[in-house]
Amino acid sequence: MSLERDTQKSCRTGKVYLVGAGPSDVELITVKGKRLLEEAEVIVYDRLVGNGVLMWGSKNARYIDVGKRSGHHPIPQEEINQILVREARKGQNVVRLKGGDPLVFGRGGEEAAVLEKAGIPFEIVPGITSAIGVPSYLGIPVTHRDLASSVHIVTAHKKDGSLPDIHYRSLAEGGGTIVFLMGVSTLGSVMEGLLGEGMSPDMPVAVLERGTTAAQRKIVGTVGTIAGKAARAKVQSPAIILVGYVAAFRHMDWYECRPLAGRKILVTRPRERSSRLAAMLREEGA
């Protein structure tokens, strides 16, 4: 019977699910995303996926770390595409797990195109993009009736690590909130671009580092001062840059009010017995 099942499996094509894990908080993945992880036979994941999210995966699944990170891509995208096609052709159900949303600067569109061309069934499962989720965890609304009626999400990082062509004039004149992703290394150049097109040097800016984790922090300044402040604070990726009047919000920082905010606690129980305690500690901000 087992041989018959294995033969049937090898003759069918599996399916690839492009799943957004949301930001780093393990509980921000969708219910559907969690279920697919529990059912997956192969899980292909990036660095920006929080380690805790992987605990939802089956202990019998095969985990493939493709380790993409800002400024360092140890596995080329072409090879990742080949992994997805290869595993699906083995009859495996594959979860391609991505931080944030798979279609918001996550290259999910490229992977979906490869799968479609190869005749591999696929499904896209949205996730909470860091452009929205991270500001929420740091008490910043990206829209506000009196301050921002629009949101612009911009990448500040090209495939080769350089600064992309950004239409600074439309951003400087358009109003609303601007969220720059993957912009730590290009922060100074981005601010110079906005200043060069007439944005006020006093426009509030917030750099949000390691958002939705216990180690998250917010560095607040202006277009004219934030590059220096971020350098002195030694900001590192992952971080997002939020430009606009809403960046000055200070009274909604709910996360930091939790009793264990910022604390690191080591849970020494086995994985199968620690999840409930870990969830309780996370709920208190640890």
Spans of features found by a protein language model:
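P-loop/Walker A phosphate-binding loop and immediately adjacent motor/lid segment at beta-alpha junctions
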Residues: 2-5, 51-83, 87-90, 199-204
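A contiguous loop/helix-start segment that scaffolds small-molecule binding in enzyme catalytic cores
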Residues: 3-4, 13-16, 89-94, 150, ...
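Glycine-rich, flexible N-terminal cofactor/catalytic loop recognition
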Residues: 9-69, 170
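Glycine-rich phosphate/diphosphate-binding loops that line cofactor/substrate pockets in enzymes
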Residues: 10, 36, 57-58, 84-92, ...
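Short, acidic/turn-prone active-site loops that include or flank metal/cofactor-
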Residues: 23, 48-50, 66-73, 128-130, ...
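Class I SAM-dependent methyltransferase SAM-binding "motif I" and its flanking Rossmann-like core
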Residues: 25, 101-174, 219
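N-terminal glycine-rich anion-binding loop in soluble enzyme alpha/beta folds
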Residues: 42-74, 262-286
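General beta-strand structural signal in soluble alpha/beta enzymes
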Residues: 44-46, 65, 95-99, 105, ...
